[in-house]
């Protein structure tokens, strides 16, 4: 007898370390039953972040699905990709294919709860076993909350203490064996009804999504898929090993470079092309290997994968908070009276037309590539919110969620709340603020990054490339870049705006403190060092704001 099981891919777009895949390959019977597997993905307008998605994100997703399809075809199967409401598609598959079991990876964020509750209800109604497995996070966020007494840990140090009680995250599960698995096929009439797609032929344009970057900019190309992710992991581990041998860790933060091919694994983690548990354990095992050959062992702990732990923290903080990416209904977010722009201020920030080269280069890189270094994300977010324009972080979240390859709801919103001093910060303490001009001089001393993404400034002398408005008019004419015509003049007096915003923050803070008990349960960092590590704040790029 053969049982029919569905493996529903959502975010975990991989075959390695995939507990839900292993579950789908189990027959749950007497042992004489074989398994017929149907691997599927559903374009329902929301799953995998497709509710708000730009060209590069959709391209990365389609490449990831095509890579899965290619791998499955090599072993006799394929990835069935459908378009439509997930419940409606599943109901027809259950009815026509006599499905015994549905398996999928847990999507812990509350934005997926209604979808998954509806699917689980359908499974109960149609007597289909529904199995959900945790593998998109290192730990189960629900277990973290239970261990912390039923509430999320309100500081990062509390989070570290809680997961220390739980213990180290599970190691990756075994590789799947398809030796005794049959892959099912979809009847043609059903395929037409549930809008079966040929994923190998899909492009962002098929979804009405078009490239918005400057095609003349020379930019990095990112490629989605498990195959590419595992290849990149090998390169990244070499970089990690060099850092460990050199006595430091987090190499992409310790020595940030904006022009070299990026080695970040975050996009692959966001779409689940790479298992976060595999990445975590590869780095930690490598560290132990390097340390075993050292005469004096250096403590590493969770710090060597600090960004992965922050990812877990933000996931945990969001899991019971459906308003996590909003301000007013969000219990952990301070309600700051942000400016509601009636002019083109927000559009100028989005399009890279602020008149501040480092900000503009970053925003144009985002449109061109779907990527920004962690430092550039922080500085552009600070500029939009408390550092300059005083526009709500909610607008920034929506823009980043649409265009950043690796943006997911929890981490993206958490970062924006922190940077804007709305949460995860000392109560409205706006003292730690990066100067985009000082940071540009520090990290792009020759202006190479700015010139790549702002070709109109390519001929300006290095002396003026980060402050083109200071170039004499004859220099501007000679370089073919007149400020105010070929490149915008600064849209604001940055120093004055920063001071005014800091004063406003202090005033709001004072009123909140005077109210005492009405102050929201505001999450905040454990110490000053945590702030500097999060923002990457050398002394010489901190502005007086």
Curated annotation (Swiss-Prot):
FAD binds at residues 236, 264, 266, 307, 374, 406-408, 412, 415. Binds 1 FAD per subunit. It is found in: Cytoplasm; Cytoplasm, Perinuclear region; Nucleus. The keyword Cell membrane does not apply. Its main location: cytoplasm. GO terms for biological process: circadian regulation of gene expression; entrainment of circadian clock by photoperiod; negative regulation of DNA-templated transcription; nucleobase-containing compound metabolic process; regulation of circadian rhythm; response to stress. It holds the Pfam family DNA_photolyase. Residues 3-138 form the Photolyase/cryptochrome alpha/beta domain. Its cofactor is FAD. PROSITE patterns: DNA_PHOTOLYASES_1_1, PHR_CRY_ALPHA_BETA. GO terms for cellular component: cytoplasm; nucleus; perinuclear region of cytoplasm. One of its GO terms (molecular function) is DNA binding. InterPro entries: Crypto/Photolyase_FAD-like_sf, Crypto/Photolyase_N_sf, Cryptochr/Photolyase_FAD-bd, Cryptochrome/DNA_photolyase_1, DNA_photolyase_1_CS_C, DNA_photolyase_N, Rossmann-like_a/b/a_fold. The keyword Flavoprotein applies. Keywords: Biological rhythms, Chromophore, Cytoplasm, FAD, Flavoprotein, Nucleotide-binding, Nucleus, Photoreceptor protein, Receptor, Repressor, Sensory transduction, Transcription, Transcription regulation. Gene3D superfamilies: 1.25.40.80, DNA Cyclobutane Dipyrimidine Photolyase, subunit A, domain 3 (1.10.579.10), HUPs (3.40.50.620). Interacts with tim and per; promoted by light conditions. FAD-binding region regulates cry stability, cry-tim interaction, and circadian photosensitivity. Blue light-dependent regulator that is the input of the circadian feedback loop. Has no photolyase activity for cyclobutane pyrimidine dimers or 6-4 photoproducts. Regulation of expression by light suggests a role in photoreception for locomotor activity rhythms. Functions, together with per, as a transcriptional repressor required for the oscillation of peripheral circadian clocks and for the correct specification of clock cells. Genes directly activated by the transcription factors Clock (Clk) and cycle (cyc) are repressed by cry. PANTHER family: CRYPTOCHROME, CRYPTOCHROME-1. Belongs to the DNA photolyase class-1 family. This is Cryptochrome-1.
């Amino acid at each position: 007898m053969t049982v029919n099981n569905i493996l529903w891919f959502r975010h975990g777009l991989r075959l390695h370390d995939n507990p839900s895949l292993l579950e789908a390959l189990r027959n749950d019977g007497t042992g004489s039953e074989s398994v017929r597997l149907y691997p599927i993905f559903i374009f329902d307008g929301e799953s995998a972040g497709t509710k708000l998605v730009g060209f590069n994100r959709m391209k990365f997703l389609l490449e990831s699905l095509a890579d899965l399809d290619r791998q499955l075809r090599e072993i006799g199967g394929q990835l069935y990709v459908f378009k439509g409401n997930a419940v409606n598609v599943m109901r027809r598959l259950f009815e026509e294919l006599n499905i015994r079991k549905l398996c999928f990876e847990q999507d812990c964020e509350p934005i997926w709860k209604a979808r998954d509750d509806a699917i689980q209800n359908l499974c109960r109604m149609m007597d289909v076993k529904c199995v959900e497995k945790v593998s998109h996070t290192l730990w189960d966020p629900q277990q973290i909350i239970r261990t912390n007494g039923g509430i999320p840990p309100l500081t990062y140090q509390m989070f570290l203490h809680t997961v220390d009680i739980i213990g180290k995250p599970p190691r990756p599960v075994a590789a799947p064996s398809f030796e005794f698995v049959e892959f099912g096929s979809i009847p043609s009439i059903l395929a037409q009804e549930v809008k079966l797609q040929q994923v190998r032929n899909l492009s962002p344009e098929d979804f009405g999504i078009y490239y918005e970057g400057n095609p003349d900019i020379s930019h990095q190309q990112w490629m989605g898929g498990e195959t590419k992710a595992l290849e990149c992991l090998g390169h990244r581990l070499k970089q990690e090993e060099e850092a460990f041998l050199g006595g430091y860790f987090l190499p992409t933060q310790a020595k940030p470079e904006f022009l070299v091919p990026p080695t970040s694994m975050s996009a692959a983690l966001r779409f689940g092309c790479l298992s976060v548990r595999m990445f975590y354990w590869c780095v930690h095992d490598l560290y132990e290997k390097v340390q075993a050959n050292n005469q004096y062992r250096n403590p590493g702990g969770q710090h060597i994968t600090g960004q992965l732990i922050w990812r877990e923290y933000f996931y945990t903080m969001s899991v019971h908070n459906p308003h996590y990416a909003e301000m007013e209904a969000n219990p952990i977010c301070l309600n700051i009276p942000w400016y509601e722009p009636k002019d083109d201020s927000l559009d100028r920030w989005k399009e890279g037309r602020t008149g501040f080269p480092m900000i503009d280069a970053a925003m144009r890189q985002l449109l061109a590539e779907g990527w920004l270094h962690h430092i550039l994300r922080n500085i552009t977010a600070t500029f939009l919110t408390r550092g300059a324009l005083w526009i709500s972080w909610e607008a920034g979240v929506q823009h980043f969620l649409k265009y950043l390859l690796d943006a997911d709801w929890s981490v993206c919103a958490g970062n924006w709340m922190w940077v804007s001093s709305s949460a995860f910060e000392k109560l409205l303490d706006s003292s730690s603020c990066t100067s985009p001009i000082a940071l540009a001089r520090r990290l792009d001393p020759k202006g190479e990054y700015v010139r790549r993404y702002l070709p109109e400034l390519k001929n300006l002398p290095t002396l003026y490339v980060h402050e083109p408005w200071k170039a004499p008019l004859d220099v501007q004419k000679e370089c073919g870049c007149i400020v105010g015509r070929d490149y915008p003049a600064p849209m604001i007096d940055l120093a004055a705006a920063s001071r005014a915003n800091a004063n406003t923050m202090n005033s709001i803070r004072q009123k909140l403190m005077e109210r005492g008990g009405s102050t929201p349960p505001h999450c905040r960092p454990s110490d000053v060092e945590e702030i500097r590590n999060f923002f990457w704040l050398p002394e010489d790029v901190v502005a007086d704001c």
